[in-house]
């Protein structure tokens, strides 16, 4: 199966956000900051601390949220040439994944991928926990082709590791 695609900025930013929010360290950081903000609010209400402490925790939470939700995905999008290229991607049960651009091509065997994840707009093909490749779901010509690709990925990615 072969698909041709480029990237839509809005969808890529959403896919990158999904990746960041799925990271355990980001989730833990958000939980800790929320707990500290709630504790600071309670202590401020009970007059145990000054309200400025609650404002500081609120500002930290807001800044972290903006960083992970807006700034980090946008900076990666702007730095990466990948999102400006046009691709041809071939999925083959025997060969693996062949990616072609005007600058060259790369073939990955299925066992080069550690896992895959599906989000609203993309299939995320992970090489390891931090590096991945996004395959837009709208690049498939119809729902049946997308289901076939999903089945191929489920059967071949993460096996034999």
How would you label these PLM feature ranges?
Residues 32-39, 56-64:
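Lipid-exposed faces of alpha-helical membrane segments in multi-pass integral membrane proteins
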Residues 1-38:
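N-terminal membrane-targeting/pre-transmembrane regions
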Residues 97, 106-121:
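Phosphoinositide-dependent membrane-docking surfaces
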Residues 91-93, 117-118, 127:
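Generic beta-strand structural signal
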Residues 1-3, 106-108, 133:
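Short beta-strand segments
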Residues 124-161:
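A membrane-cytosol interface segment of integral membrane proteins
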Residues 66-107:
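Conserved beta-hairpin
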Residues 45-60:
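Hydrophobic alpha-helical transmembrane segments
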